[in-house]
Amino acid sequence: MHLPGCPPAMADGSFSLAGHLLRSPGGSTSRLHSIEAILGFTKEDGILDTFPAERSSRGSKERDPRLGARSACPKAPAGGSESSPPAAPGLVPEFEATRPCYPKEQGEARPSPGLPVGPAAGDSKLSEEEEPPKKKHRRNRTTFTTYQLHELERAFEKSHYPDVYSREELAGKVNLPEVRVQVWFQNRRAKWRRQEKLEVSSMKLQDSPLLSFSRSPPSSALAPLGGPGSGSGPPGSALPLEPWLGPPLPGGGATALQSLPGFGPPGQGLPASYTPPPPFLNSAPLGPGLQQLGPPPAYPCAPAFGDKFSLEEAYPRNSSIAALRLKAKEHIQAIGKPWQAL
């Protein structure tokens, strides 16, 4: 036993804890008055300091099962069980003491001790995504005055596509930016195109009834023409057109020829001042029109016609349709000669 305070003993380190253990391998529990005891070092601390290799191997054995079990949280060791030695107080990070324990899934990376753990890193990304999109800047509408609109319309009448120099000159005249003038011309051209399309469509709608109306009268006008020629129409259904302008129609039935003065029953003579019209001209409205033309030069033809075909001979022949047609042709030819001379 050496007393503390002996200088030779302190110099050679005989009072170290390792030397004490070698001298007393039994590990007596009696506290010696050594330098370690005076300085406050315990026996366990001395053992830990003496065997650093054993401490590192023991700590690695306990860390390996903890890393292998990812679904369970590390629990505090029990009082009687062997636990890993406490590390130095300056090496333990503060975040490990306050970090909550969550079961880890496979493939999940463990957070590095140098970075803060928690939703702080993800919150910044979520906040950026959840922010509403910025509203598009909308330009205020330009309100044109009457003078500006008048000048712009005048320029548009001159040219629908003014060049940049004309636009700049007009912009300075109406006190507007050149960009606003350009946009106004674009809108005005679009409006002009819409108006042109509407006008074309309206003209097409108006033309369609006119075409149908213009095609219908010729088809309806064929009925009056066929009526008097065939003798089936009434005597008063004559055309309002001038009859001598059209070609003479061939003779019809016996009723049309009997209406002529020359082919009537005996006792009716031809007047000297009247020329019998063709069958399709037998209508009252056309009688005065023919009389106003003056005395026709066909007077000599009437007596010759009467001399050749007497009334007494003509009346019995009414029963013969062939004779009636022959007389009608000759009569029309005789009447057509004076009008051709005019």
Curated annotation (Swiss-Prot):
Position of sequence motif OAR: 319-332
Record carries keyword Transit peptide: no
Positions occupied by motif Nuclear localization signal: 325-329
Keyword match Amino-acid biosynthesis: no
UniProt-listed SMART domains: HOX
Position of sequence motif Octapeptide motif: 33-40
Subcellular location: Nucleus
GO cellular component: nucleus
DNA-binding region extent: 137-196
Residues covered by region (Disordered): 49-141, 209-295
GO biological process: brain development; camera-type eye development; hypothalamus development; limb development; pattern specification process; positive regulation of transcription by RNA polymerase II; regulation of transcription by RNA polymerase II
Keyword annotations of the record: Developmental protein, DNA-binding, Homeobox, Nucleus, Transcription, Transcription regulation
Biased composition regions of type Basic and acidic residues, renumbered to the chain: 55-67
GO molecular function: DNA-binding transcription activator activity, RNA polymerase II-specific; DNA-binding transcription factor activity, RNA polymerase II-specific; RNA polymerase II cis-regulatory region sequence-specific DNA binding; sequence-specific double-stranded DNA binding
Main location as per UniProt: nucleus
InterPro entries named among the record's database cross-references: HD (IPR001356), Homeobox_CS (IPR017970), Homeodomain-like_sf (IPR009057), OAR_dom (IPR003654), RAX/RAX2 (IPR043562)
Positions with biased composition (Low complexity): 209-225, 235-244
Similarity annotation: Belongs to the paired homeobox family. Bicoid subfamily.
Biological role: Plays a critical role in eye formation by regulating the initial specification of retinal cells and/or their subsequent proliferation. Binds to the photoreceptor conserved element-I (PCE-1/Ret 1) in the photoreceptor cell-specific arrestin promoter.
Name of the protein: Retinal homeobox protein Rx
The species this protein was found in: Rattus norvegicus
Gene: Rax
